[in-house]
């Protein structure tokens, strides 16, 4: 990139770099690196490499967008999430249960320190996330800030697993059978963003709520019960 004079870089990072939160909401200047899973560790390591790059060469401008939990689908219903094998994330798993592709949703733990005992996350619609990327590109093009800058992309509101299930039932008109099982190693109880920096620097704010996310995810899934056609 440097050889071809390309020195502006937008990195798809993750809120998992924060690890177990010291306090909430999560703010960009909080300590990172106490990651609870390999995915978060890799995101953290790349951020550290990019920080070193910016420190070694002031020509570089790097924005690290820390995604919270991207879900949903394009509003057209033509583009959606089609994971290989068994989904690792909540929303596509719920969607596959809703169309009968899977029999039951496994809820990992109901003994967290949350109102209903299930884990709470900040879910963000992929369309809001895409707009966040465009805003970051515009910011870099016209302001071209040197150095490394981390920016959260989230709604600032957390929803529990059970709240997401109920929202999807409302969107689909179908009951979602679920079973409570043991916690998964590495899962934390609560995570949600302070997204004020994105609003201040990029002029960005998430506009879609959990109902919108579930409606669009269901629209995609019911039209593509077996995912993309090969």
Set out the residue ranges of the language-model regions:
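Structural signature of the Rossmann-like NAD(P)-dependent dehydrogenase/reductase core
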Residues: 9-11, 63-66, 122, 152-154
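Catalytic helix-loop patch of NAD(P)-dependent Rossmann-fold dehydrogenases
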Residues: 3, 7-8, 17-69, 78-89
